[in-house]
Amino acid sequence: MMRQSLQAVLPEISGNKTSPLRKSVCSDLLTLFNSPHSALPSLLVSGMPEWQVHNPSDKHLQSWYCRQLRSALLFHEPRIAALQVNLKEAYCHTLAISLEIMLYHDDESLTFDLVWDNGGWRSATLENVS
Protein backbone atom coordinates (compact mmCIF):
# COMPACT_ATOMS: atom_id res chain seq x y z
CA MET A 1 0.00 0.00 0.00
CA MET A 2 2.78 2.46 0.92
CA ARG A 3 4.54 1.53 -2.33
CA GLN A 4 1.49 2.51 -4.36
CA SER A 5 1.07 5.84 -2.59
CA LEU A 6 4.74 6.69 -3.13
CA GLN A 7 4.47 5.85 -6.82
CA ALA A 8 1.49 8.17 -7.07
CA VAL A 9 3.45 11.21 -5.86
CA LEU A 10 6.82 10.54 -7.47
CA PRO A 11 7.63 12.70 -10.48
CA GLU A 12 7.21 11.26 -13.94
CA ILE A 13 10.48 10.17 -15.48
CA SER A 14 9.78 11.45 -18.98
CA GLY A 15 10.31 15.15 -19.47
CA ASN A 16 11.64 15.64 -15.93
CA LYS A 17 15.27 16.24 -15.05
CA THR A 18 14.89 14.64 -11.62
CA SER A 19 17.64 12.11 -11.11
CA PRO A 20 16.93 8.60 -9.84
CA LEU A 21 19.16 9.39 -6.84
CA ARG A 22 17.04 12.40 -5.84
CA LYS A 23 13.79 10.46 -6.24
CA SER A 24 15.19 7.56 -4.25
CA VAL A 25 16.35 9.77 -1.37
CA CYS A 26 13.00 11.60 -1.18
CA SER A 27 11.06 8.35 -1.34
CA ASP A 28 13.23 6.77 1.36
CA LEU A 29 12.92 9.83 3.62
CA LEU A 30 9.14 9.87 3.27
CA THR A 31 9.04 6.15 4.08
CA LEU A 32 11.30 6.71 7.10
CA PHE A 33 9.09 9.50 8.43
CA ASN A 34 5.90 7.46 8.01
CA SER A 35 7.20 4.13 9.28
CA PRO A 36 5.36 3.06 12.45
CA HIS A 37 8.62 1.61 13.75
CA SER A 38 10.90 4.33 12.49
CA ALA A 39 14.41 4.58 13.83
CA LEU A 40 13.85 8.32 14.25
CA PRO A 41 12.84 9.63 17.70
CA SER A 42 9.06 9.64 18.16
CA LEU A 43 8.77 13.44 18.38
CA LEU A 44 10.40 13.69 14.99
CA VAL A 45 8.11 11.26 13.19
CA SER A 46 4.95 11.14 15.27
CA GLY A 47 5.30 14.85 15.74
CA MET A 48 1.88 16.11 16.51
CA PRO A 49 0.80 14.43 19.78
CA GLU A 50 4.11 15.32 21.42
CA TRP A 51 4.34 18.68 19.65
CA GLN A 52 0.98 19.83 21.02
CA VAL A 53 2.12 19.27 24.61
CA HIS A 54 4.99 21.71 24.18
CA ASN A 55 4.82 25.37 23.28
CA PRO A 56 5.33 25.25 19.51
CA SER A 57 6.25 28.93 19.36
CA ASP A 58 9.19 28.37 21.73
CA LYS A 59 12.33 29.21 19.69
CA HIS A 60 14.49 26.95 21.88
CA LEU A 61 12.15 24.01 21.22
CA GLN A 62 12.18 24.76 17.49
CA SER A 63 15.96 24.93 17.43
CA TRP A 64 16.25 21.69 19.42
CA TYR A 65 13.79 19.95 17.09
CA CYS A 66 15.75 21.00 14.00
CA ARG A 67 19.07 19.89 15.51
CA GLN A 68 17.67 16.52 16.59
CA LEU A 69 16.05 15.89 13.23
CA ARG A 70 19.20 16.88 11.35
CA SER A 71 21.34 14.57 13.47
CA ALA A 72 18.95 11.63 13.09
CA LEU A 73 18.59 12.05 9.32
CA LEU A 74 22.33 12.33 8.75
CA PHE A 75 22.79 9.14 10.77
CA HIS A 76 20.09 7.19 8.90
CA GLU A 77 20.63 8.43 5.33
CA PRO A 78 24.24 7.93 4.17
CA ARG A 79 23.63 9.55 0.75
CA ILE A 80 23.24 12.98 2.38
CA ALA A 81 26.46 15.00 2.45
CA ALA A 82 25.01 18.13 4.08
CA LEU A 83 21.63 18.97 5.53
CA GLN A 84 19.82 22.02 6.84
CA VAL A 85 16.46 21.63 8.61
CA ASN A 86 14.07 24.57 8.87
CA LEU A 87 10.62 24.84 10.38
CA LYS A 88 8.26 26.49 7.92
CA GLU A 89 5.21 26.35 10.18
CA ALA A 90 5.01 25.41 13.84
CA TYR A 91 1.56 25.73 15.33
CA CYS A 92 -0.46 23.51 17.65
CA HIS A 93 -2.01 21.49 14.83
CA THR A 94 0.39 22.22 11.99
CA LEU A 95 4.01 21.30 11.54
CA ALA A 96 5.81 21.90 8.25
CA ILE A 97 9.52 21.39 7.75
CA SER A 98 11.88 22.09 4.90
CA LEU A 99 14.99 20.01 4.30
CA GLU A 100 17.79 21.58 2.25
CA ILE A 101 19.85 18.58 1.17
CA MET A 102 23.20 18.22 -0.56
CA LEU A 103 23.71 14.69 -1.83
CA TYR A 104 27.02 13.03 -2.53
CA HIS A 105 27.67 12.93 -6.30
CA ASP A 106 25.16 15.75 -6.96
CA ASP A 107 26.18 19.36 -7.56
CA GLU A 108 22.84 21.01 -6.83
CA SER A 109 20.91 21.21 -3.58
CA LEU A 110 17.62 19.40 -3.13
CA THR A 111 14.72 20.99 -1.26
CA PHE A 112 12.28 18.55 0.32
CA ASP A 113 9.28 19.96 2.22
CA LEU A 114 7.22 17.82 4.59
CA VAL A 115 3.92 18.59 6.30
CA TRP A 116 2.29 16.79 9.23
CA ASP A 117 -1.22 16.10 7.94
CA ASN A 118 -3.99 13.91 9.42
CA GLY A 119 -1.70 11.75 11.52
CA GLY A 120 1.12 11.31 9.03
CA TRP A 121 3.79 13.07 7.05
CA ARG A 122 3.22 13.98 3.43
CA SER A 123 5.50 15.62 0.94
CA ALA A 124 4.68 19.15 -0.06
CA THR A 125 7.26 19.06 -2.84
CA LEU A 126 7.76 15.47 -3.96
CA GLU A 127 5.90 16.09 -7.19
CA ASN A 128 8.39 18.84 -8.01
CA VAL A 129 11.65 17.39 -6.71
CA SER A 130 14.44 19.14 -8.56
From Swiss-Prot:
Molecular function terms, GO-annotated: anti-sigma factor antagonist activity
InterPro entries: Anti-adapt_IraD, IraD/Gp25-like
Listed GO biological process terms: cellular response to oxidative stress; DNA damage response
Keyword Transmembrane included in the entry's annotation: no
Record SUPFAM superfamilies: gpW/gp25-like
Compartment(s): Cytoplasm
Cellular-component GO terms for this entry: cytoplasm
Coiled-coil ranges from the UniProt annotation: none
Keywords linked to the UniProt accession: Cytoplasm, Stress response
Function: Inhibits RpoS proteolysis by regulating RssB activity, thereby increasing the stability of the sigma stress factor RpoS during oxidative stress. Its effect on RpoS stability is due to its interaction with RssB, which probably blocks the interaction of RssB with RpoS, and the consequent delivery of the RssB-RpoS complex to the ClpXP protein degradation pathway.
Family: Belongs to the GpW/Gp25 family. IraD subfamily.
HAMAP family listed in its UniProt record: IraD (MF_02010)
NCBIfam families the record matches: PRK14128.1-1, PRK14128.1-3
Assembly mode: Interacts with RssB.
Designated name of the protein: Anti-adapter protein IraD
Organism: Escherichia coli O139:H28 (strain E24377A / ETEC)
Primary gene name: iraD
